[in-house]
Design a protein with these regions (language model features):
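Sequence context surrounding c-type heme c attachment/ligation sites in exported
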Residues: 8-131
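Sec/Tat signal peptide C-region and signal peptidase I cleavage site
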Residues: 2-8
Length: 131
């Protein structure tokens, strides 16, 4: 809810969104490993989790979180809010697509590259400070 978000401090929001992006990255590595080993049920469960996290992340960039508290995002997120949100939605939708197609893919690595890792890269190259 909007009220709960406004009551949350900028510091908490920044820490939480960093933790969620970090979690998605670690989950993506697990998805890669599980899918490569044919453990699709667990991989799909994690894909769904990632998909939901991307939707949550859209709400984690209020105006008061542009700087401070070791945030690693560029101000461009707020200037291009619709583009950023679209990228989060695409990332979420691509994970859902993966759930329904991953078992039938011949090239699992390539498919994960296209539908999972490319979204990480697209966002990082544009909206994350170089580090």
């Amino acid at each position: 809810s909007t009220n709960a978000k406004s009551e949350q401090s900028a510091e908490d929001i920044i820490k939480n969104r960093k933790a969620l992006f970090s979690k998605n990255y670690n989950t993506a590595k697990k998805v890669q490993s599980l899918s490569s080993n044919g453990d699709f049920d667990e991989a799909k469960r994690l894909m769904l989790e990632m998909s939901e996290n991307y939707i949550t992340l859209k709400e984690m960039f209020p105006e008061n979180t542009k700087e401070g508290f070791k945030t690693e995002v560029t101000p461009l997120i707020w200037e291009e809010k619709e583009k950023f949100n679209s990228l989060m939605e695409k990332s979420s939708n691509d994970m859902v697509q993966l759930i329904s197609t991953i078992e039938d893919e011949d090239d699992i690595r390539g498919t994960l590259g296209k539908l999972m890792w490319s979204n990480c890269k697209a966002c990082h190259s544009k909206y994350r400070l170089p580090h």
